[in-house]
């Protein structure tokens, strides 16, 4: 679960100051990685249980991943449309957009509510909320934490990078 949270920090950092097109591309590619890691079991189901050859199973799974990644791309467009250059935007708008896209993904076209971000933290201190508010709302809570912690982490990374550069110059 720590990698899922770290990946959200990276996504927030990459989307800062981007336009709608760039946000779509970044979020879409994030979605490809997200789904590629999370639903590799679909390939196994298609290939072994569906008795379909390896190449066809791979292509079907890849098409499925690209279709699901469109939701993340839509998230990027929605976030870039509603956000403004502020920490409040990251804390408020980012979680709302993420939650709306997860709800949409769970409803539209008979839904595919798998890999909800809220279920990744079921074994953490936030896991107790899972049974009370559900996975989708727990995702929003997780994204609020990610949005709130993102600026301090980004500024720390800048300080670390500058320190490395300074150290390199001194050497």
Predicted regions span which residues?
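Membrane-embedded alpha-helical bundles of multi-pass enzymes
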Residues: 1-152, 171
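Low-acidity, Ser/Thr- and Arg-rich intrinsically disordered low-complexity segments
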Residues: 150, 155-156, 161-163, 168
């Amino acid at each position: 679960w720590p990698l899922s949270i770290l990946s959200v920090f990276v996504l927030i950092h990459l989307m800062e100051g981007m336009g709608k097109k760039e946000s779509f591309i970044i979020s879409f590619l994030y979605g490809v990685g997200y789904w590629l890691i999370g639903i590799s079991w679909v390939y196994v189901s298609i290939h072994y249980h569906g008795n379909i050859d390896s190449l066809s199973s791979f292509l079907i799974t890849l098409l499925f991943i690209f279709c699901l990644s469109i939701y993340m791309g839509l998230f990027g467009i929605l976030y870039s449309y509603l956000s403004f250059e502020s920490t409040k935007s990251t804390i408020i708008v980012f979680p709302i957009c993420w939650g709306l896209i997860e709800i949409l993904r769970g409803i539209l076209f008979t839904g595919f509510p798998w890999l909800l971000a809220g279920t990744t933290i079921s074994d953490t201190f936030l896991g107790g909320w899972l049974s009370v508010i559900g996975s989708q709302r727990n995702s929003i809570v997780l994204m609020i934490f990610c949005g709130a912690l993102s600026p301090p982490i980004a500024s720390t990374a800048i300080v670390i990078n500058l320190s490395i550069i300074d150290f390199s110059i001194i050497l």
